[in-house]
Design a protein with these regions (language model features):
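Extended redox/cofactor-interaction regions of prokaryotic respiratory oxidoreductases
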Residues: 344-423, 427-428, 453, 515, ...
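Surface/interface-facing alpha-helical segments and adjacent flexible terminal/loop regions used
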Residues: 1-205
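N-terminal leader/propeptide and maturation segments of large enzyme subunits in energy/redox metabolism
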Residues: 292-308, 465-521, 711-809, 846, ...
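N-terminal export/assembly segments and adjacent metallocofactor-ligating motifs
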Residues: 199-467, 493, 498, 638, ...
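Glycine/threonine-rich phosphate-binding loop and adjacent beta-strand/alpha-helix elements that clamp
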Residues: 386, 690-714, 724-725, 729-731, ...
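Phosphate/diphosphate-binding loops
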Residues: 233, 429, 655, 661-665, ...
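Long, contiguous, secondary-structure-rich segments that constitute the structural scaffold
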Residues: 208, 721-771, 857-859, 863-873, ...
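Active-site phosphate/pyrophosphate-binding segments
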Residues: 458, 483-613
Length: 973
């Protein structure tokens, strides 16, 4: 093959990966190429290529088929991580610079894109052909050989293999054959190529890529950029909210390292934070706006422009709003982005300006404890600042694993200091978690959903031993005894009489609780006495034990313990509940007033899709109206994976969303083709935090704000949700109101920051530009102690409850007259708990937990983190032995809702009778249905997505998620 033949072939391949229509025109005009492709060559119709050809092309190379991934970039082909814009990309760019090549930026692709590599080789050939002496020619020949060996050979072979595997098209297979011939693995051309059928291939210079170099000569070398440091911060729903330094060069991310944050704050990232670039700069990114062309869930789309995406959304919104009213519109729960300019705020503001939308209350994280806390204290803010833990004499971490979940960037360091001081730390959890290993003096395993029984028995013991704080109970609470009851509630329904069996005939002794919880009675007595005697003592719950079918009652039981012992509102104590701390005000994107008054529990959105018009205040605890007037017909699902992956009973949700007569439009944005995005009608490829400026608030606790500075430009054709809603708001004539009269996103963010700073001068926020350089730490902040004012001055500061006191017994709950919502705290067995007769069929309990390698579903695509912490089912040796299972076996976990096939870890770090599976793995269904009768209509998940097995059984009061209350069986595959 001579150099002109190679140049011609490389020009053809450049055109193929750049503009396929131009390529086909070239082929059609060159007899040799036309002969090679023969009848397989696509034919033009009305000046365009056939739609089926263009769809097939986009499926292979543009990401419109969710099941096809071909790595098209040297960085992804030459590493195990599949990262974009890494050191490999930088090497490619610097090679371009050395020889004066100006990369084209083909369709938003990174510079090491396969088409760009082919074009660079064309450029080098053109430079060689332009050279007048052999020495100069050899420079460019050597450069081409070295570049090919270092980058293009592997990239081309990987791409050719991907084409051959994913496509049956003879035309595409011949393209793959041409690539294999040009870049043979063993040095010999593959048979049946254009070089065999058309030796001496050549065509006119104007069809050769970079042919202008023949006249102009090589471009001068370009200077290399020096590396620089960008300070930024993560914005997903992570308990850490850390600060990181990004080393960038030539638009490539070379490293992420710890940044202590503004003013020396300890905001160091964990392994997740240091791997952000490996998560987000992944070749499987969504690349272009798309509209669904197949059935929902099939993952088949067609590429569209931003204008077409806005057109589609505008048309669907107008059509559905006109037909069903604003109550058919809904912004789904999702917190993949929690920064100031997060997309859910943008969407809510837009909808509120155009008629309103159905709203939601609560969160999947804590809705049940939120309800319990609000009814008991009249406020959600029941937590103390982490620093106050240093004042406690005794700590119970109840269903709490801050070593993994972080729970505020300061929490882990404070707990480490507390342990070093010698303060006793107890952890109550079905699992021997990371926090047990790192912090606990004692691990108390407990059967899931029985925490309320343990709380009852501890309260009974404390009262029986005379360790209760009677002054606190009488002064600040109602409901502990008959003499202190809220108005309208019979005196006999007090908590004391419940504990002592006067109400139901069952005394809540430790022996009673042992049979329910699996916790020995002596252990219950010991920790009850220790907790009550150690004042100040802190009972610090996590959120896992309230994500059960009886989660509200569990939370109320733990609150009752803190009040019984007088540990509320004092340094070193703790009020339990949902635990949020009101430290400093935080900026937010104002959604404005929603003209539509209907509000549902965040967990009930699928019910609102199915039968929203039947949902009522009494039955479904909707707010704002007595009965909804519409089903959900339009969903914005933005930066969230709750549409499928994180909602209970995935197979039920899939079936519901596949019925397009129910929800008629789903417009969604994300960085990846997540399981939820596969069910979208409109797909918007969003930029990651590494590509966009923003402002980040701390997670739950924190005296600071963090700047989020873009490290690189948005990859591919990423669409900022702000730009999308800007265009949409212009279509509906509300842009000025929506944007606060700001012309663009950057100025809007600055406006919101400066408005917030002006509203809160005591925070001492710096000018915007200086803030974006380093962020800001607030000065002189005192630790927040929940309800300290009410405890110090009860006559001046009253609780925001009907009685003005802590309502251990609630008149509001009594008025509901629902046996599943008692007026007093107390253990209630729940569906699929350990006492459910269904255990005869599905004998094992299954809980989820937060793994250290993921933040919900974020990072599940990160190969490095998966290697560090693979997805496994935890099962106790006793349960494994009964089923012939050994460590590392692939097992099937199943119940009537579905099945999962995954490897197991046989470990005594889980209670007998209980299994555990980390939440957040991306739902990946098998293409086959399981053998046998169990769940035969549903394909098994192959990645360990726990919500295949969780049930849609809303809790009685909050109508929240019970996703840690599941019964399953496990068998060896």
């Amino acid at each position: 093959m001579n150099i002109r033949e190679k140049w011609a072939a490389l020009s053809l391949l450049t055109g193929f990966f750049d503009e396929p229509e131009t390529l086909v025109r070239i082929i059609s005009s060159v007899p040799a190429f036309k002969e090679y492709f023969g009848p397989d060559l696509p034919r033009f119709s009305n000046g365009s290529l056939p739609e089926d050809f263009l769809l097939a092309y986009d499926d292979l190379f543009k990401g419109t088929n969710a099941d096809i991934y071909i790595p098209l970039w040297a960085s992804c082909c030459l590493s195990d991580t599949g990262c974009l814009l890494d050191h490999t990309t930088l090497e490619v760019i610097r090679t371009y610079h050395r020889y004066g090549y100006i990369h084209k930026g083909m369709d938003g692709n990174p510079p090491d894109y396969i088409g760009e590599q082919f074009r660079f080789l064309c450029y080098l050939i053109a430079c060689c052909e332009n050279s007048k002496d052999e020495a100069s020619k050899n420079i460019f020949r050597k450069a081409a050989d070295e570049f090919t060996a270092r980058f293009t050979l592997v990239t081309a072979r990987r791409v050719a293999a991907g084409i051959s595997f994913h496509s049956d098209s003879p035309f595409f297979k011949k393209i793959a054959g041409l690539m294999q011939a040009l870049f043979p693995a063993d040095g010999r051309p593959a048979p049946d190529t254009v070089f065999d059928t058309a030796p001496g291939l050549s065509f006119s210079e104007d069809l050769l890529e970079c042919s202008e170099i023949l006249k102009s000569g090589p471009n001068p070398p370009a200077a290399d950029e020096p590396p620089r440091i960008i300070r930024t911060s993560g914005r997903n729903n992570c308990g850490g909210k850390c600060a990181v330094k990004v080393t960038v060069c030539e638009g490539c991310i070379l490293d992420l390292s710890a940044d202590c944050g503004p003013d020396g704050l300890e905001l160091k990232p964990c392994l997740r934070g240091l791997s952000y670039h490996r998560t987000y700069m992944d070749g499987r990114r969504l690349r272009y706006p798309m509209i669904r062309r197949g059935k929902r869930g099939e993952g088949l789309f067609r590429r569209v422009s931003l204008k077409e995406a806005v057109d589609y959304t505008e048309n669907m919104l107008r059509k559905l709003t006109s037909k069903y009213g604003p109550g058919c519109r809904y912004v789904n729960y999702g917190f993949g982005v929690t920064s100031l300019m997060g997309p859910n705020g943008l969407a809510s503001r837009f909808l509120n300006l155009t008629g309103g939308a159905l709203g939601y209350y609560g969160s999947y994280s804590s809705i049940n404890s939120e309800a319990a806390t609000a009814y008991t204290y009249g406020s959600y803010f029941s937590g103390n600042s982490p620093e106050d833990l240093l004042n406690t004499n005794y700590l119970i971490l109840w269903a709490h694993n801050p070593v993994s979940t972080v729970f505020g960037i300061r929490t882990r360091s404070v707990l480490s200091i507390l342990k070093a001081k010698g303060t006793k730390i107890i952890v109550i959890d079905p699992r021997c978690s990371e926090s047990v290993k790192a912090l606990a003096d004692e691990w108390i395993p407990i059967l899931p959903s029985t925490d309320g029984a343990l709380a009852d028995a501890m309260a009974y013991t404390i009262w029986s031993e005379g360790l209760e704080d009677q002054h606190f109970m009488d002064t600040y609470c109602v409901g502990f005894d008959a003499e202190h009851m809220p108005e309208g509630v019979p005196k006999e329904l007090n908590y004391h009489d419940y504990l002592y069996g006067i109400i139901d005939g069952t005394v809540k002794t430790p022996e009673w609780a042992e049979k329910i919880t699996g916790v020995p009675a002596e252990t219950i007595r010991k920790i009850a006495v220790e907790y009550a005697s150690a004042k100040p003592a802190c009972l610090l719950p996590g959120l896992g034990n309230q994500r059960t079918g009886n989660g509200e009652q569990t939370a109320r039981g733990l609150i009752a313990l803190t009040c019984l012992t007088g540990n509320v509102g004092i340094p070193g104590g703790g009020a339990a509940g949902c635990g949020a701390a009101l430290e400093e005000p935080m900026p937010f994107f104002p959604a404005g007033t929603n003209p539509y008054k209907g509000v549902i529990s965040c967990f009930l959105w699928t019910q609102a899709v199915e039968e929203g018009h039947k949902m009522t205040r009494d039955k479904d605890h909707i707010l704002g109206m007595d009965k909804l007037d519409a089903d959900i017909k339009f969903i914005f699902n933005l930066a969230g994976n709750t549409l499928i992956n994180q909602h209970s009973d995935i197979n039920r949700t899939k079936k519901l969303l596949q019925d397009e007569s129910k929800c008629e439009c789903i417009a969604a944005s994300d960085v990846f083709m997540t399981p939820s995005m596969r069910f979208a009608d409109l797909v918007l490829p969003a930029p990651s935090f590494l590509e966009e400026d923003d402002i980040n608030m701390p997670w739950r606790y924190g005296h600071y704000l963090l700047a989020e500075n873009a490290a690189v430009k948005p990859v591919f054709c990423s669409v900022s949700e702000y730009d999308f809603f800007e265009e949409l708001s212009k279509r509906f004539g509300v842009f000025s109101q929506w944007s606060d009269f700001c012309p663009d996103r950057a100025s809007h963010m600055k406006y919101l920051y400066e408005h917030f700073a002006a509203m809160h001068p005591a925070l001492g926020l710096p000018p915007f530009d200086r803030f974006m350089d380093r962020g800001h730490a607030y000065k002189g902040s005192e630790p927040f102690i929940a309800f300290a004012d009410q405890i110090r001055n009860p006559d001046i500061y009253r609780f925001s409850t009907p009685s003005g006191k802590i309502e251990i017994v609630s008149g509001s709950l009594y008025a509901m007259q629902d046996p599943d919502i008692p007026a007093h705290p107390g253990y209630l067995p729940c569906r699929e708990g350990p006492a459910d007769p269904l255990r005869e069929k599905y004998p094992l309990q299954l809980i989820g937990f937060h793994t250290i390698r993921r933040c919900h579903t974020v990072h599940d695509n990160n190969a490095l983190l998966e290697k560090a912490d693979p997805q496994l089912l935890w099962i106790h040796p006793q349960d494994a032995a009964a089923r012939g299972i050994i460590d590392g076996d692939t097992v099937r976990i199943f119940n009537e809702r579905g099945g999962i096939r995954i490897r197991c870890s046989v470990t005594d770090h889980i209670m007998p009778g209980v299994t555990a599976l980390a939440e957040g793995a991306w739902y990946t269904p098998s293409r086959e249905t399981p053998d046998g009768n169990e769940c035969s209509s549903f394909p098994d998940d192959l990645r360990g997505s726990i919500n295949v097995l969780t049930g849609f059984y809303p809790t009685p009061l909050a109508k929240g998620n019970p996703q840690h209350t599941n019964l399953v069986e496990v068998v060896k595959c």
